A protein has these predicted regions:
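Short, acidic Gly/Pro/Ser/Thr-rich loop/turn segments
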Residues: 9, 56-57
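Catalytic P-loop NTP-binding/switch module of NTPases
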Residues: 1-41, 45-51
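Non-catalytic alpha/beta scaffold blocks inside enzyme catalytic domains
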Residues: 16, 26, 30-32, 41-42, ...
Length: 255
């Protein structure tokens, strides 16, 4: 484990963690039903989505299904730093490859962000869905967020985007859920839950499954194993891989 991964953990137990739903409805079932109704009524192409490349493959897969139904413009936020070309990679997102393979992020991650900002400015984008990012740091200002009819955000800690949101859905840290990532070498690796979510927070894949069903009518698996296996059947890069096959070492796929 790198030093950043070993030492950067205290935020998980931060006193500022988002632990309750913010919005007109504050119970999960009612909030998701309300959001689903809003999305069903949204004209095609009037919704955009920014989903972090720190989300799991399973979460990104469900978000992609939602985006396809809504004809939503999507992207992820590139996150780069210093690399040593040996052990430390310059890409600081743990799942950039997953976001690209699943289709949330374009090949040039971040290239759709200016288009989303312009769409909000022009009024063609009226609803924005954000998972795990503070978009005010990547060209979508708080003023632009104020122009939206609906801003739906899921995150772990408060930021300027959660402050502007009409709905905030509290998500989980990696240690509080299960899922998988695709690393820089193309190895699909799974991780396991070792602590309970804070307050009323839920694993994103769990409530996304409910939301996708409410919006699209497409039911799916309610276990992480079944969800991964369903994704592997639909996303070409993952075909032939199963959750069980990942084991402790993972499985390498073609990038």
């Amino acid at each position: 484990m790198c030093d950043a991964g070993r030492l950067n953990y205290k935020w998980i137990n931060s006193e500022f963690r988002l632990t309750q739903i913010k919005g007109p409805k504050t119970e999960w079932s009612l909030a998701l039903r309300d959001i689903a109704e809003t999305l069903r009524k949204a004209p095609l192409g009037s919704v955009a989505m920014v989903a972090s490349a720190r989300q799991t493959n399973e979460e990104l897969y469900l978000l992609k299904k939602l985006a396809t139904k809504l004809n939503a413009l999507t992207d992820s936020v590139p996150r780069t730093g210093e690399g040593d070309k040996l052990l430390v990679n310059a890409d600081k997102n743990p799942n950039s490859n997953g976001a690209k393979l699943i289709g949330i992020a374009p090949a040039q991650m971040g290239s759709n962000l200016p288009k989303i900002a312009e769409g909000i400015h022009s009024g063609s984008i009226k609803t924005l869905i954000v998972f795990g990012e503070d978009v005010t740091k990547c060209g979508i200002s708080a003023d632009l967020l104020g122009k939206l009819s609906t801003l739906i955000v899921s995150d772990i800690l408060p930021n300027k985007t959660t402050e502007a949101a009409h709905y905030v859905l509290p998500g989980c840290a990696h240690a509080e859920k299960r899922g998988s990532f695709v690393n820089t070498k193309g190895r699909v690796q799974r991780f396991m839950q070792n602590t309970q979510p804070k307050g009323n927070a839920r694993a994103e894949w769990e409530f996304l499954h409910e939301l996708v069903y409410d919006v699209t009518g497409q039911n799916g698996f309610v276990s992480i194993e079944g969800l991964f296996n369903q994704m592997a059947k639909e996303v070409p890069a993952f075909q032939g891989v199963t959750w069980a096959a990942l084991g402790d070492l993972g499985v390498t796929i073609n990038l």
